[in-house]
Amino acid sequence: MLSKIRQAKDRILQLIAFHVPGAKSLRVRLHRCRGVKIGQNVWIGYQVLLDTSRPDLISVGDNVIISVRAMLIAHFRGPQGITIEEDAFIGPGAIILPNVTIGRGAVVTAGSVVSSSVQPMTVVQGNPARPIATCGVALGEKTDMGQFLRSLRPLERPSTGRRN
């Protein structure tokens, strides 16, 4: 019975957090009440979905940005979890799947589906998300975009054997 009450409470808090303003205040507090471990100075965008059944399996470090409509799915059949380390950026509509660690300062681009861990200071893109660049500066709330873009170093793509 207590488990059912907790599940109902978690879903109600998720629904409220999904719609209310307060990316750095109210949403963060609501998700903490659900059991998500959230560091300091975290920004959670509008309509972000953090695992509805096992929010306690999600850990978010300091200075993380989770953009609008991102989804963090922390488990399928067993406790696996998601860890987002400090200074990471999760782009709009990105999906983070279970048993993944997003490294310090990593960037997940918009719409990417992350099914394996991301190295620190790495930019990933696509479905499934693949590394496309390294970055010398974390993409934070106050980061100058020009400075971030200048710090990017594209990764070499493996040869496909095709001629252009």
Task: List the model feature ranges, each with a label.
Residues 2-50:
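Extended, small-residue-rich solenoid/repeat segments and analogous flexible loops
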Residues 31-32, 36-38, 42-125, 129-131:
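Structural signal for interior beta-strand "rungs" in well-ordered beta-sheet cores
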Residues 6, 11, 24-34, 54, ...:
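Arginine residue identity/basic-tract feature
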